[in-house]
């Protein structure tokens, strides 16, 4: 009798003393679901330049230059362009270009970018602040992935502000293994995928319903630059 009561007491202690898992089940965190995919509409008529509409956002046409009155001062710049991302309440300036990795010498970079040869090009995006955080600008640095990295969804870049970092990985899971077919760029916060984009002739976009409104705008801006790339 006493042994039975003791065992029951120990079981209760172990039950209530075990760490509580505060994470949602893995299935609930899957990004690639129908309800989180945004339809991408492309407007590319005979007499109009290409624009994109996805989710609540629309881009202007791409302008092939760095915008005036900005402080982008890289010495080596290739294929610069800029556009505006618009929703119902604001518009955000987005600029993009290619520049060698050496342009970021002296700046902190994650290991997967730091190890890139100095002359290798990086795709660079500068995103102006949103209405609620007008002074906070974001930048994205992205290297060109190797197909072996795509096979394993390896990190190839970073989207960051002064106090926030979002990892960017890339994979070919919608295409063929050992290939560059249907490269999907995935944005991750604390290891969880929160957005993804497949550029190209048949683009696809996913954005998690769990991200905050301001983060969603920044992700949408980065996605727009990758669609235009």
Language model: regions and residue ranges:
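Sec-dependent N-terminal signal peptides
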Residues: 4-14
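Intrinsically disordered, low-complexity proline/glycine-rich segments
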Residues: 18-229
């Amino acid at each position: 009798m006493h042994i039975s009561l003791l065992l029951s007491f120990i079981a209760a202690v172990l039950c209530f003393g075990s760490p509580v898992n505060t994470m949602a089940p893995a299935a609930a965190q899957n990004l690639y679901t129908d309800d989180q995919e945004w339809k991408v509409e492309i407007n590319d008529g005979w007499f109009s330049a290409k624009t994109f509409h996805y989710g609540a956002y629309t881009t202007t046409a791409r302008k092939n230059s760095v915008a005036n009155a900005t402080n982008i001062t890289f010495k080596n710049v290739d294929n610069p362009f800029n556009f505006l991302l618009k929703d119902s309440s604001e518009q955000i300036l987005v600029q993009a270009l290619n520049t060698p990795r050496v342009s970021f010498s002296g700046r902190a970079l994650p290991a997967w970018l730091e190890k890139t040869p100095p002359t290798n090009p990086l795709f660079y995006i500068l995103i102006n602040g949103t209405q609620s955080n007008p002074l906070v600008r974001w930048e994205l640095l992205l290297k060109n992935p190797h197909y072996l990295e795509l096979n394993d969804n390896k990190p190839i870049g970073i989207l960051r502000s002064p106090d926030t970092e979002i990892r960017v990985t890339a994979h070919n899971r919608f295409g063929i293994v050992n290939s560059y077919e249907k490269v999907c760029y995935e944005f991750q916060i604390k290891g969880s995928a929160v957005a993804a984009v497949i550029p190209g002739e048949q683009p696809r976009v996913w954005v998690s319903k769990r991200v905050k409104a301001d983060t969603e705008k920044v992700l949408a801006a980065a996605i727009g630059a990758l669609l235009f790339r």
